[in-house]
């Protein structure tokens, strides 16, 4: 999906923000927040602090100010500060790429943990957000009522070599072509294979 901007975590990885900790913080910042906000906010934070120790050394007020354009920034500041402290206490200044470890942090769910592991470590995992869920069901590639069920269906059906790429490709595709309402079917490059499940109006 080259014509459209990359999803935020993949773009940040291209810019050199590839550590587990950096990707995790960017993922937390991205929750309920547009990529157009996530990217500059993450860059601003990382210009000030990129490691657990550096983030832990920030005051809560400074951290909150750095991420304030993000939705629910006060809650996220609490989560990020707590995670930084736990990482420093348990691991020093490097967060391991372990799924169970990521899921143990408050506010980190399977979607975020999988995305971080896929981008930061190349771990074969699938991250299903609203775009991946919508597009794969609209295609009728899977038939699932929730993102969680879509994840299980994709893990069964999708070849493992595509597990990381499905998020990288379908997030921008879902944002710019296969949108939630009135998808741009007239300019869709894969219209011929799409079953258009649930589509009542399109452009």
Task: Identify the function of each model-found stretch.
Residues 122, 140-141, 198, 202-203:
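Glycine-centered secondary-structure boundary/capping sites
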Residues 130, 145-148, 189:
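Short, charged hinge/linker segments at domain and secondary-structure junctions
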Residues 142, 146-161:
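Pocket-forming structural segment of enzyme catalytic cores
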Residues 23-29, 80-86, 95-140, 150-153, ...:
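Catalytic DNA-binding helix-loop module of base-excision-repair DNA glycosylases/AP lyases
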Residues 1-97, 161-162, 169-203:
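N-terminal polyanion-binding entry modules of DNA glycosylases/AP lyases
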């Amino acid at each position: 999906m080259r014509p459209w901007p990359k999803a935020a975590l993949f773009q940040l990885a291209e810019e050199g923000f590839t550590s587990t900790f950096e990707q995790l913080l960017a993922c937390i910042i991205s929750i309920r927040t547009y990529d157009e906000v996530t990217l500059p906010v993450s860059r601003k934070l990382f210009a000030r602090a990129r490691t657990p120790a550096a983030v832990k050394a920030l005051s809560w007020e400074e951290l909150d100010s750095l991420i304030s354009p993000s939705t629910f920034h006060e809650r996220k500041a609490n989560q990020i500060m707590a995670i930084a402290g736990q990482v420093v206490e348990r691991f020093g200044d490097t967060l391991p790429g372990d799924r169970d470890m990521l899921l143990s942090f408050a506010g980190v769910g399977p979607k975020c943990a999988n995305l971080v592991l896929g981008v930061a470590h190349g771990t074969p995992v699938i991250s299903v957000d609203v775009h991946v869920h919508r597009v794969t069901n609209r295609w009728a590639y899977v038939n699932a009522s929730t993102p969680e069920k879509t994840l299980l269906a994709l893990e069964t059906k999708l070849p493992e070599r595509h597990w990381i790429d499905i998020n990288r490709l379908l997030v921008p595709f879902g944002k710019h072509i296969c949108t939630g309402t009135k998808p741009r079917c007239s300019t869709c490059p894969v219209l011929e294979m799409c079953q258009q499940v649930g589509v009542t109006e399109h452009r």
